[in-house]
Structures are given as structure tokens and as C-alpha cells.
Amino acid sequence: MPLVPIGTLIRPGRGLGAFNVVSLEHAEAVVAGAEAAGLPVVLQISHNCVRFHGGRLRPVARAAAAVAEGSTARVALHLDHVEDEALLHQAADAGFGSAMFDASGLPYARNVAATRAAAGWAHAHGLWLEAELGEVGGKAGGTAVGAAGGTAGGAAGGAAGGAAGGAAGGAAGGTAGGVAGGTAGGTPGAHSPQARTDPAQALDFVTATGVDALAVAVGSTHAMTTRTAELDQDLIVRLHAAVPVPLVLHGSSGVPDGELRRAVRHGIAKVNIGTALNLAFTGAVRQRLAADPAVTDPRRYLAPARDAMAAAVARLLGVLALGDRDLTEHDIA
């Protein structure tokens, strides 16, 4: 089936699952999971994925698109966490229908200016654009839109003058940062109420930038490996009432099923998931290699890993599709 515009897949009361892919096996697993669930899905290629592939967007985009087009599922192709305009400007020609431009590490006024310019370019080239406001935290790979000397720490930057460390460094002159949304001496981390998206500011941001969707900070964090995050459901309700575009939840791997379903019921339209799939994938690889340490053919461990990821995708899509259903005690557990 041809790629589908992401906007046509968003429906009130159902969370649209958006899954990050790193390899061909990831893309195959996500699409297989969507087919099994009978639900639409988003294949997401992040800026970090592009870095992993040597900075070359087109090969991984073409591979993901080919997998989607060979499927019976409705699939959108989305470029996630774009941190510079040069990569954004490759998106339309590479087959993407949408992108997420991430200038959230900049001070508010600069975030607005950079995002407004990105949205103008995207709309002129037929792209749907998502942006972020607030501190979700946990992103690896650097700060948004070259924020050296700004307020957010990079994953590989030097700590000169920085007040808060990241996983591998902080921003020169920066006051907050880190792959874990660290708080040492700086800005509160992603789980702190002070880091969350303000509804009034969110409305101003959307109005000023013209974006098509907004990723909001409501208590989740990227790269969590335990499902212990507690979302600010009241804030989601207020954001949904204030903002006229779909809301997006990033860092959803650490959010329990019941919390995800509540979030969808309260107004989250798109749910980004990556780490949970990597846990399923690498767990299956470890299990296969532990059972047969002498195996040398990568297909012997990649096939079960792909199957495990597909099962995780199908399950999570089912969770998100039930966002408008009355919750039970089982869901809340």
C-alpha cells in the first residue's frame, strides 16, 4: 500500500503508534505488528538514526518506505527529532510526509523563531510538521538546533561553564542538560513539574509557529527501560482544551498501559515509542545467543528478534487503540 499522510491516520479517542526504526529488521517488525493488529502505524526515522547510518538519510528512508509499500497496513513515514534545517530540507525528496523539528532546547523566543521558519518551509513543500515545547528529556545525540552557549546540554559537548552535566557532557555556557534530563545544579529534570508544558504558552507557541502537532512534556522521559512514569493527566486535559492541534507524547516506553490509555482518552493523539521495541529486540537476541553461543549466522538471532519486536508493536497498538474504552482494574495495573 502507498505511504499514507500522517494527518489522515489521527483519530479522536485512538492513539496513533509511532515507532522508531534503526534497521531494516526494525521496519519489518513495525509493519508486521501493524498488520497483525489491523491498525495504522507510523515508521519514524530519527536524526540519531541518520547519524548511525553515516549521515545518509535517503538509503534508510527508501528501505523503510519499501517495507511500508509492500504491506497491507496503512503506514506513514515520519522524520523524527530533526535538529537542523539541512536535514529537514532533505525530507520531502526522501519520501517523508511529515517531520518533527526539535528546537525545544533553545530559549522560548528562539524556539518559536526556529520552529516558525521550519514550519513555513515544511508547509511550502507539502510536509506536516510537529514541534516540541517543554522538557521531555532523555534524548541522546546533542542539543536542538545548535544550542552551544544556550541553555541545554549536548550529549557530546564540553562542560566548560556548564552548570548541569549530561550523560557525556554539557553545553558550553549551558545551565541544564543531559541525556537523562539531569538536574545537578541546573534546570529541573523532565519529571519535575517545572519542566512541563504550560497550556497558555503552548497555545501561544502553536499560534506563533503554525505547527501541525505539538509534543508536550507531561511527565515522560526518553529512553526509560522501566515502565514507572506517571503522567500528569490533568495537564493533558488542560493542554488538549487549550491547543487546537494534535498532542504528541514522547518517551512513551516508560509509561504503563493504563497511563497510556488515560493519556489517549484525555487528548494525546500520537504516541512515540522506541526503547520498548529495542528491549524486545535485544532481549530476543540475548536469549538466542545464550542458547547457542556458537551461532555465527546473524539470521539465526535477527529473525526471533524481529518477531519479538513485531509482537511488542501489535500489543502496544492494541493498548493505544483502546484509549477510548472504559478502563478496568486490569488496565490500571
Where are these regions (language model features)?
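Alpha/beta enzyme core
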Residues: L3-P12, L24-C49, R58-S71, V82-G150, ...
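Terminal accessory/targeting
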Residues: T8, G13-A18, D324, T328
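Histidine-centered catalytic micro-motifs
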Residues: G17-V21, L77-V82, P246-V255
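Cofactor-binding active-site loop characterized by glycine-rich and histidine/acidic residues
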Residues: G54
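Electropositive, surface-exposed helix/loop patches at the edges of structured domains
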Residues: L77-L87, E132-G146, V211-A213, D292, ...
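Long, intrinsically disordered low-complexity tandem-repeat segments
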Residues: A144-T187
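Active-site proximal loops enriched in glycine and acidic residues that flank catalytic Cys/His/Asp
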Residues: V218, G251-S253, T275
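C-terminal alpha-helical cap/extension of soluble enzyme domains
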Residues: P256-A333
